[in-house]
Every structure is written in C-alpha cells, then in structure tokens.
C-alpha cells in the first residue's frame, strides 16, 4: 500500500475544482474508513483536509467540511479503486495518493504526527 503518483504515473488535472491540500475520499459503509474516522477529524483540525464522501453526506458526523460525492462524479474523475484514499493536491494537480489506513504512511504523507494513536496501525481499504 505505497504512496503512488497519480494514476498511470502522471500528474492529472483535478476533475472539477478540487481544493489544494489533502483530500480524503471515504464512505461510511467501509470498515477502514469507519476505523479512521477520528483521524479525519484530527486532520481537519491540524491540516488542510477536505473529505469527499461516497455514500453518506453526514460521515463523519463531527464534520462540517464534508463534500457530498454520492453521485461519484469526483470519485470516478479521480479514478479511485478503493476507499479510504488520501490524495495530495498542489496547484490543482494530484501529486500523490495512498489507499487504506496505514498510520506510518499517513503520518509521512500528511506531515502530521501522532495520527490515530489508539487505532490499529494498519487496515487495508
């Protein structure tokens, strides 16, 4: 579950107008997403995170920064294979992504330490 460049190894323009920073694409009906819910809340407070949810616009319930993607337009445009997927967007371009919950990888990816200290260190997406 390595960090990867955008699909096909190239930088692709974002579908629509995605914000720069970190983007998490999640769904409530995903065990890894449900497990990582407190991490999304934490990242929203400590980093520039936007969450796109595929199935429940109220997931995570603590958030007012969730974007409804129940029509999957963003997810399809980003060519996602699994959730949770964490993406880095710079200058309107996806520069990296990682899939599934992996504490060490997410800390490296986000530059934020001590993510989900009470969670198992790994759960595939």
Question: Language model features by range: what are they?
Answer:
Residues 1-22, 45:
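A short beta-strand-turn-helix
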Residues 45-71:
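Thiol-based oxidoreductase modules, predominantly thioredoxin-like and allied folds used
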Residues 26-32:
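Short pre-active-site segment immediately N-terminal to redox-active cysteine/selenocysteine motifs
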Residues 77, 81-124:
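Non-catalytic, surface beta->alpha helical segment in thiol-disulfide oxidoreductase systems
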Residues 22-23, 86:
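Hydrophobic beta-strand anchors of alpha/beta hydrolase catalytic cores
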Residues 32-47:
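Typically the conserved alpha-helix immediately C-terminal to a functionally engaged Cys/Sec
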Residues 37-41, 58, 75:
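Short amphipathic alpha-helical segments and helix-helix/interface helices
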């Amino acid at each position: 579950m390595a960090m990867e460049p955008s699909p096909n190894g190239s930088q692709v323009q974002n579908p629509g107008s995605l914000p720069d920073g970190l983007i998490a694409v999640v769904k409530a009906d995903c065990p890894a997403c449900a497990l990582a819910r407190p991490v999304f809340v934490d990242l929203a407070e400590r980093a520039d995170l936007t969450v796109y949810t595929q199935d429940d616009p109220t997931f995570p319930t603590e958030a007012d920064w969730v974007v409804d993607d129940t029509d999957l337009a963003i997810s399809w445009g980003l060519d996602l294979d699994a959730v949770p997927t964490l993406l880095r967007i710079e200058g309107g371009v996806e520069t990296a992504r990682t899939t599934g919950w992996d504490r060490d990888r997410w800390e490296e990816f986000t530059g934020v330490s001590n993510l989900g200290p009470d969670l198992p260190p790994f759960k595939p997406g």
